[in-house]
A protein has these predicted regions:
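Extended aliphatic helical segments
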Residues: 5-8, 18, 36, 54, ...
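Exposed alpha-helical structural elements
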Residues: 20, 79-83, 234, 238
Length: 244
């Protein structure tokens, strides 16, 4: 079973309430209680721009919704960041991310103190697109030379041009098409103690759906970035905030 979600995660502000999302994104979200979200019609899916999952943790708030994250990641539209920064002025760090197994797109954009410090995205048709100074989590994955046994295990054939990365601590292998997924997972765990890959805390999920007139169909999980990536800040001092 794969994963298909995008969103934004940040330090938990005081008095967070869904009414803030309604105001920020001009919506009328209604809470879906308990497991009833599994029975909704149409099916609940955070790739729908009207379906939101909010995960609350001791160290984070994560808002999962394609309308919040995808435009920023795929079309360089920073509206969501500016809107959330206005609503949460005390929050100085945010990470927007996407983990789309079905569309083959993985990546993130990290902000600190009002600046985009790093953007890293892999999309099927565009390949790797990145800007800014790599975060320490990326340095844990280095280009790998496969052993003879690994070549067999990965079913390499003549002319195979796949590239692999190896985790410097665990030795885990990841193809270049999936390494961003691994980096997002590690980055969020290190910074916020949680990742969307976790499924052992469903009770911390809250499910919301917009009024019918505000819903849009499931996003197509954009497979191609459009335009130029936004310029990342070159101020290295911002990076000291990550993995202190």
């Amino acid at each position: 079973m794969g994963i298909a979600v995008s969103g934004v995660i940040f330090d938990p502000p005081k008095d967070f309430d869904v009414s803030i999302l309604n105001r920020a994104f001009a919506l009328s979200l209604e809470k879906i209680e308990g497991k009833v979200y599994l029975l909704t019609n149409p099916k609940f899916d955070p790739r729908n721009k009207g379906d939101f999952i909010v995960h609350r943790g001791d160290r984070h708030i994560c808002i999962m919704n394609s309308g919040v994250a995808d435009d920023l990641l795929f079309t360089n539209d920073l509206t969501s960041y500016h809107v959330l920064s206005r609503e949460f002025p005390a929050v100085d760090r945010m990470i927007f991310f996407c983990l789309y197994d079905s569309g083959g797109s993985y990546g993130y954009s990290a902000f600190a103190d009002g600046e985009l410090i790093r953007s890293k995205l892999y999309a099927v048709h565009e390949g790797h697109v990145e800007s800014g100074i790599p975060l320490p989590a990326e340095g844990k994955w280095q280009p790998a030379i496969l052993t003879a046994q690994e070549i067999i295990d990965e079913d390499f054939e003549d002319g195979d041009e796949r590239r692999f990365f190896r985790h410097v601590t665990t030795g885990r292998l990841a193809p270049d098409t999936l390494v961003n997924s691994c980096i997002v997972d590690e980055l969020l765990r290190a910074e916020y103690g949680w990742s969307p890959f976790d499924d052992d805390h469903p009770s911390k999920n809250e499910y919301y759906r917009a009024a019918e007139a505000e819903r849009l169909p499931v996003s197509s999980e954009p497979a191609k970035t459009l335009g130029r990536q936004p310029e990342a800040s070159s101020i290295r001092s911002f990076l000291r905030r990550w993995f202190r």
